[in-house]
């Protein structure tokens, strides 16, 4: 990662080895804190696994009509975001590897343009992930507290419009990040967006779980009460809690890195923390790998559809193993 005073979004999201590509010196960094090098194979493996898993998730949602609900549409949006961030990191790693080993010769200016595209993809992904998680949280809130009117409030058409708005907003953010990549205010904007959405989601969760128990008791007295639906709604809320928890754990070091990059780039301790940037990229990719596992763990319908898709492509030994679960 580049720790130069030129605070570009590019510098914040490249691997440590990019300094050799651009021929820039790493300043303000303690000699005791060297950049952590991670094998290219690790990035490629995580990128490939994430790609396959999230394609499986999207395929399951498309294939199974029982998964054609607003919550799973938002899950599909989250899967696309996960796939995007993993693939952008993997592609960037391949590009850096090829240039470092002189397999391809590209002008520094063109390399920077390519990296701007990769960085934009990461920005689009994190904003899309946050927006999709927020949409799922709102969907679960409506399911629990407005159960009898849920299908009138959250229709498939409305969920489609919401997803379209999410990705239009995210792509617009990506374009802005490319245009103003030299400004540190772009980074401040991204950090502010992260904590603002995090605040809304956590507040919604606290409110949701504090009131859920009393609401369940009250609605249970209604003759139209559906206990199965209510349990499914709470299960969906717990699944979302797991997704949000993993998202915070995996993305927080990255955003802390951005904060330190702006606030204390010359501090030795900040420099030491920033020297592990490659590890923070790995954590982000791990988030993309873990999310589909959570879907499979929490949804029997999703597991069954995964099995059908895998078996449909002739992996009979894998199907035999899956059949045990």
Curated annotation (Swiss-Prot):
Task: Tell me the classification of the organism that encodes this protein.
Answer: Eukaryota, Metazoa, Chordata, Craniata, Vertebrata
Where, subcellularly, is it found? Cell membrane
Q: Keyword Cell membrane on this protein?
A: yes
* Primary location class: membrane
**InterPro entries reported for this sequence:** GPCR_Rhodpsn, GPCR_Rhodpsn_7TM, MC3-5R, Melancort_rcpt_5, Melcrt_ACTH_rcpt
- Which species is listed as the source? Rattus norvegicus
Q: In which tissues is it expressed?
A: Very low expression levels is detected in brain, while high levels are found in adrenals, stomach, lung and spleen.
The lineage's top-level taxon is Eukaryota
Functionally, this protein is described as follows:
Receptor for MSH (alpha, beta and gamma) and ACTH. The activity of this receptor is mediated by G proteins which activate adenylate cyclase. This receptor is a possible mediator of the immunomodulation properties of melanocortins.
Q: What is this protein called?
A: Melanocortin receptor 5
Q: Where is the lipid attached (S-palmitoyl cysteine)?
A: 311-312
